[in-house]
């Protein structure tokens, strides 16, 4: 038990346009070098592109994309008696969201479209349809956990 008071998690302010905390978090993941206004422009442009291509609400598509990218299990390295095992562990909900956003942005950055907004929109549309690089990353992580299921009893 810590002797001092445990600091609680800070509440994130919702984004100015859609008043969504999820979108505000996503903007922070996209942001580089503290350029938040640029990150906001990229996100909002990507959501506009998604709205043009699909008739559904773009926030629903973003949520669906993140749902399809969220991992439920991952592997962690655990050293036991001189050898290192990849031990499958369940992922906490906050980390699930963080990983999904990070993987979606990484996959978008590797795409070939002209602007980041178009890349992000393309990756969001792909992920919402259960295809694309970010979904493949989740599948790889799940496959790795499945392959190392034998070491699950080393969990901590």
UniProtKB/Swiss-Prot annotation:
<keyword id="KW-0689">Ribosomal protein</keyword>
<keyword id="KW-0820">tRNA-binding</keyword>
<keyword id="KW-0694">RNA-binding</keyword>
<dbReference type="GO" id="GO:0003735">
    <property type="term" value="F:structural constituent of ribosome"/>
</dbReference>
<keyword id="KW-0699">rRNA-binding</keyword>
<dbReference type="GO" id="GO:0006412">
    <property type="term" value="P:translation"/>
</dbReference>
<dbReference type="Pfam" id="PF00177">
    <property type="entry name" value="Ribosomal_S7"/>
</dbReference>
<protein>
    <recommendedName>
        <fullName>Small ribosomal subunit protein uS7</fullName>
    </recommendedName>
</protein>
<dbReference type="InterPro" id="IPR020606">
    <property type="entry name" value="Ribosomal_uS7_CS"/>
</dbReference>
<dbReference type="InterPro" id="IPR000235">
    <property type="entry name" value="Ribosomal_uS7"/>
</dbReference>
<keyword id="KW-0687">Ribonucleoprotein</keyword>
<dbReference type="InterPro" id="IPR005717">
    <property type="entry name" value="Ribosomal_uS7_bac/org-type"/>
</dbReference>
<dbReference type="GO" id="GO:0019843">
    <property type="term" value="F:rRNA binding"/>
</dbReference>
<dbReference type="InterPro" id="IPR036823">
    <property type="entry name" value="Ribosomal_uS7_dom_sf"/>
</dbReference>
<comment type="subunit">
    <text>Part of the 30S ribosomal subunit. Contacts proteins S9 and S11.</text>
</comment>
<comment type="function">
    <text>One of the primary rRNA binding proteins, it binds directly to 16S rRNA where it nucleates assembly of the head domain of the 30S subunit. Is located at the subunit interface close to the decoding center, probably blocks exit of the E-site tRNA.</text>
</comment>
<dbReference type="GO" id="GO:0000049">
    <property type="term" value="F:tRNA binding"/>
</dbReference>
<dbReference type="GO" id="GO:0015935">
    <property type="term" value="C:small ribosomal subunit"/>
</dbReference>
<dbReference type="InterPro" id="IPR023798">
    <property type="entry name" value="Ribosomal_uS7_dom"/>
</dbReference>
<comment type="similarity">
    <text>Belongs to the universal ribosomal protein uS7 family.</text>
</comment>
